[in-house]
Amino acid sequence: MTRHAAPILTTLLDTDAYKLHMQQAVFHRYYDVTVTAEFRCRGEDMLGIYADELVQQIANMASLTLTDNEFAYLSSLPFFKTDYLNWLRTFRYNPEQVTVQNLQGKLDIRISGPWREVILWEVPLLALISEVVHRHRSPQITPEQAVSRLKSKLEQFKRLTCDLDMSRFRLMDFGTRRRFSHDVQLAVVSTLKQDFPWLVGSSNYDIARRLNIAPVGTQAHEWFQAHQQISPTLENCQRAALQAWLDEYPDRLGIALTDCITTDAFLRDFGSEFAHAYQGLRHDSGDPFEWGEKAIAHYQQLNIDPLSKTLVFSDNLDLDKAVGLYRHFEQRINVIFGIGTRLSCDIPQVKPLNIVIKLVECNGKPVAKLSDSPGKTICHDKAFVRALRKAFDLPRVKKAS
């Protein structure tokens, strides 16, 4: 299938902010670390038929470079150091790092190489897969249809919140990875900027730059996964990851992701020093109400006022779920809502893809993600899962994918 040969990705900044934020930390601290990542389709979609077209699109990515205007934009932000940005100017995607196959109808993708380079593949590659598939399945869909759907949801949102003080409600666009298309995401976020006063930013650097809104994002599971092999001891790997992040970003980007090895294990490592230093926590699996209560209780046990901290909710959210969480928590702790697929691929008759790319190896050794939702568990090596479970005193883990 090669109907759409024109490049879908046209800028290096069409990615999520946390990828550049993590890449800078890897560039400074783990320059020679190597990793392998793999694609997973959590649904039943047989996506192998798109392999040839994806190979062509991946080849196109080798020509993407940071433009002078984009360099100036990144230089104006408080996150980046000059040595990293100068290196990023020289960065080129290397398609030889990516193996794409159609295995009996299933799409198989494996990415291997230096972490500082591999780290940038995940988000644009997922966006690419999503857009290629939706172009074939729903060629008639336009950005206007997505905006029409959004506007009806915003009317429903007004009705849901008419009795609420919304002054503390904040929304972020997290829609890049599973969007219908770049044009749909841009149209949706543009509409939110115009019609939704609670929008505070986008995870997509290109869209944030175009619309003059804040780029948002800190770190992903891979930051914690890689430290399972970078850290000299497995028991200390989460603390090592948390400390390395603070060393790179001592006074900003202070939201920590909690569910790489379950939230309970994370909170045991998230002691007073980390809890004071970090601005807050991000939820990405498991029951969000239960998680939020655990987080508040943890801060209270450490004699930290929860109202001085922030919880970011980002797991399979829509506006209705966000309102429910806001009602429950907003008077006790600051809350922000990151909504992805339900903004950038919420179109009648369109089924979003449930796809991910996750680390499976670091320096040739296994890493794992054992989240608060067993269906999201990822690891090849059962012995390593057992070692991780023992190191963090976890209950029996359901079958890894």
From Swiss-Prot:
A Gene Ontology term for the protein's cellular component: cytosol
- Give EC number(s), comma-separated: 6.3.4.21
Query: What are the UniProt keywords, alphabetically?
Result: Ligase, Phosphoprotein, Pyridine nucleotide biosynthesis
Please name the GO terms that the record assigns under molecular function.
nicotinate phosphoribosyltransferase activity
Enzyme class per UniProt? ligase
Question: What pathway, per the record?
Answer: Cofactor biosynthesis; NAD(+) biosynthesis; nicotinate D-ribonucleotide from nicotinate: step 1/1
The answer, when asked if Transmembrane helix is one of the entry's keywords, is: no
In what way is this protein post-translationally modified?
Transiently phosphorylated on a His residue during the reaction cycle. Phosphorylation strongly increases the affinity for substrates and increases the rate of nicotinate D-ribonucleotide production. Dephosphorylation regenerates the low-affinity form of the enzyme, leading to product release.
Record InterPro entries = N/Namide_PRibTrfase, NAPRTase_N, Nic_PRibTrfase, Nic_PRibTrfase-Fam, Nicotinate_pribotase-like_C
List Phosphohistidine occurrences by residue: H221
User: Domain of life of the organism in this record?
Assistant: Bacteria
Q: Does the keyword Nuclease apply?
A: no
Reactions accelerated catalytically: nicotinate + 5-phospho-alpha-D-ribose 1-diphosphate + ATP + H2O = nicotinate beta-D-ribonucleotide + ADP + phosphate + diphosphate
User: What exactly does this protein do?
Assistant: Catalyzes the synthesis of beta-nicotinate D-ribonucleotide from nicotinate and 5-phospho-D-ribose 1-phosphate at the expense of ATP.
Query: Which family does the record claim for this protein?
Result: Belongs to the NAPRTase family.
Q: What is this protein identified as? A: Nicotinate phosphoribosyltransferase
Look up and give the organism this protein is from: Erwinia tasmaniensis (strain DSM 17950 / CFBP 7177 / CIP 109463 / NCPPB 4357 / Et1/99)
State the gene name recorded for this protein: pncB
